[in-house]
Each structure stands twice: as structure tokens, then as C-alpha cells.
């Protein structure tokens, strides 16, 4: 379970970094060269999703819970935005959903 969660966390970071670098280029006028590491990060994100031993749709569904929590961590650390009570309440709910799906994929 820990290995799966850590893999999901690294996967989420790759997705967020790739999207963030693209966002910097579009919204903040960053150099077009930022698209190269963005593309590499997004390619790594896709590859990491293939490392799970479950059907792709199930992996994507479970990954969503960890993505939500990672995005909230990014919001706080990188964007410098304080988390709200709704963020703090929603994150554990998302993780519970991920946990239910991951535990279940070993039993089907």
C-alpha cells in the first residue's frame, strides 16, 4: 500500500510540474523553452501510471485521491495559499476513496 501511494505521489508531482510549467508559459509569459521540461515531466507522468498492476481505469480512479492531496500541498507550498477547512475536510475523503479502490483491486 505504501509503495502504491508513493508511486501515486511521484506521479502526481510529475503531472502537476508539467502542467505548471505550461501554465507559466501561457499565463506568465515564461520562455517557450519551459515547454521542454514540461513535456518530459508529462511523459514521465504517463509512464508512471503504467507501472500499476491494475486495469487503467481503476488506476486512474485511485490516483485521483492522491492527486487531490498533492495538488493541495502544491497550493500551500508553491502558490503560498492557505488551505481552507474545506480543503482539510476534502483531502481525507479523497484518500479514503483511493484506499477503498486500491484495497479492492487486489481482490477482483
From Swiss-Prot:
Keywords linked to the UniProt accession: Cell inner membrane, Cell membrane, Membrane, Transmembrane, Transmembrane helix
Stretches of the chain found on the membrane's Cytoplasmic side: 27-30, 82-84
Localization (cell): Cell inner membrane
GO cellular component: plasma membrane
Positions of disulphide bridges: none
Primary subcellular site in the record, as a coarse category: membrane
Name assigned to this protein: UPF0060 membrane protein YnfA
Originating organism: Salmonella dublin (strain CT_02021853)
Lineage of origin: Bacteria, Pseudomonadati, Pseudomonadota, Gammaproteobacteria, Enterobacterales
Primary gene name: ynfA
